[in-house]
Amino acid sequence: AVSRNMDVLLIDTAGRLQTNQNLMEELKKVKRVIGKVLPGAPHQTLLVLDATLGQNSISQAKLFHQALGLDGFVMTKLDGTSKGGVVFNLSRELKLPIHFIGVGEKAEDLQEFDPESFVEALIYCN
């Protein structure tokens, strides 16, 4: 990212990483190396969670937060049958904000999280 003069770096771990200690250690190492290459980086560490996982995502988030020190979350698949009620418990339990939500598969379907609009959509959902 630095050599290509990029402002944003996304690292996809392909999920279920928290169940494998070796992979979690490797992810910690990646974070340390990024900090050495670019002092002060990473500037934010966000965990992307699938809203359809429900309350199971809280235990997953806790493990990632312990390992990496998260700054917040991105909740995906909020366009399906899942209403994303886990958002409230997740944010309360870890005291971290939801930054973005995914409501589809296209880049424009990734939206900045607006708590008021989210609650309104939950309450007035048909």
Predicted regions and their residues:
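P-loop/Walker A NTP-binding module and the surrounding RecA-like catalytic core of P-loop NTPases
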Residues: A1-N126
